[in-house]
UniProtKB/Swiss-Prot annotation:
Pfam families: FA_synthesis (PF02504). Its main location: cytoplasm. This is Phosphate acyltransferase. The gene is plsX. Homodimer. Probably interacts with PlsY. It comes from Sulfurimonas denitrificans (strain ATCC 33889 / DSM 1251) (Thiomicrospira denitrificans (strain ATCC 33889 / DSM 1251)). One of its GO terms (molecular function) is phosphate:acyl-[acyl carrier protein] acyltransferase activity. InterPro entries: FA_synthesis, Phospholipid_synth_PlsX-like. Belongs to the PlsX family. Catalyzes the reversible formation of acyl-phosphate (acyl-PO(4)) from acyl-[acyl-carrier-protein] (acyl-ACP). This enzyme utilizes acyl-ACP as fatty acyl donor, but not acyl-CoA. Keywords: Cytoplasm, Lipid biosynthesis, Lipid metabolism, Phospholipid biosynthesis, Phospholipid metabolism, Transferase. GO terms for biological process: fatty acid biosynthetic process; phospholipid biosynthetic process.
Amino acid sequence: MVKIAIDAMGGDFGPKPIIDGCIQALKQKLFIPILVGKKSEILPLLPKRYRDKISIVEADDVVSMHDAATDALKRSESSIYKAIELVKNGEAQGVVSAGHSGATMTLATLRLGRLKGVLRPALVALMPTKSSRRSVILDVGANVDSKAEHLMQFAVMGGCYAEDMFKITTPSIGLLANGEEKSKGNELTKATFKLLEGYKGFKGNVEGSDIFNASCDVIVCDGFVGNLVLKASEGVASTITGLIKEYIRKSPVAITGALLMRKVFVLLKKQMDYAEIGGAPLIGIQGCVIVSHGKSNPKAIKNAIFQAISYVDTGVNGHIIQRLETLKNREN
């Protein structure tokens, strides 16, 4: 049974939504949860009937959002450090944390190490599309500066992820640029294009709109661009949702119409809600680490745990190692 270490202290709202999410996950799937944090704060929030099903690892320190990411390396008593160490020591297969994302990625990369052949790990986001399937975009923040060789590997890792997690036989892969033509892009994307030409599934350059129109399964970019895309998308979704609510409240007719369209709004929310995904996997490292939003509610934590379980069960890491090894042999 898969063991998942959960950083109980990492979220913006304390341990309660994280513990509640863990309990929700236990009700639906078989796994072994390990809550890492201050036992004095966790136990009062943990119903007695779950105390024999959830173990607690004491951690009396918390890396806050105001701390530098590299400070986490010196904080061996912090909840995220101890959660990562559980994976390193083989006591857990995956980590879920809604805490300091920079600290989580730094610890995961330096304490767990990269997979064989991986130059840089990448953070993956699953974006909503007009179809029922989400698009995979990476990197969305693990690397601000990247080389063409890194983006080439992101394409390989993203393809493996899409194959294993979404059962896509040959995922289509696009390189995010300012136009579809081969001549478009900056020096980085042009150099990456040359490396990806001929790679199975590569369809060329794609534009920002292609992230959401389901024309491409995997979109590759550097972490600076990817993070801007992610944050801008969150902002647009939040603004549109707010405007719809505001305009509906202003008109009795609109309120009636909204009631009639309630089912449509529920389906739309399900497709757009980050809590449905749970978090962003950091791929290319030993083990499994899911980086969740600081504002994660119990539903988001539950789905982050589910994502970690699926990641471990499908063997994504082994697939990545094998694919990179095959590419290396072809180059030689």
